[in-house]
Amino acid sequence: MRKAKIISLIFSIFFILGLCAYYFYPSTTVSTDRAKATREEQIEDGDIIFQTSLSAQSEAIQQATNSKYSHCGIIYKNNGRFYVYEAAETVKLTPLDEWVAKGKDGHYVIKRLRIANQILTFNTLKKMKEEGSKFLGKSYDSAFDWSDEKIYSSELVWKIYKRGAEVEVGKLQYLRDFDLTGEEVEQKLKERYGDKIPKDEIVISPASIFNSSMLETVISHTL
């Protein structure tokens, strides 16, 4: 009799746990899937996405540009799936969810040209991707040189829009225009240039693109 009661108790516990899993976990999954579906309904080919990178130089970029965003890329849709064309270790296509997961706290902002429906036609997007493909596989440019030999994230975005759509998203600046006095900034500059800092080098920052009046916010997501 006692053995039967124990078996009955164990069965009851598993039954209750099963009900909890049924009622709570599926709803979480459904909620996540629904949020993802809603996000993808809002995204369009050619949108620009921003995040706070977790890279070693992220804090220096934030200090120098007085912005929380240190990394960006262009969203492409291929075979029904969304990717981010980015300059990270190399220039590559990264699945959107994977790209988002690499940023701080899962936060990201997606922006779009205010007149995207007039400018980003099928042929223009095609040309942008053709121009972008010329950078595929190139190494990340940690020295922020304006040549095409290596390339950094905001430079990739700016050049694709300029050469593919004849649009300048963000104002070009010189390295000397930034705040170079922060501790992290000074350390990175010393590592890369020694005492010969190229202050007259042309630079485009994620902040400059983010703040462009030509763009409007489509999504601002925080976990």
Q: Model-found features: residue ranges?
A:
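Cysteine-nucleophile amide-bond enzymes
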Residues: 2-223
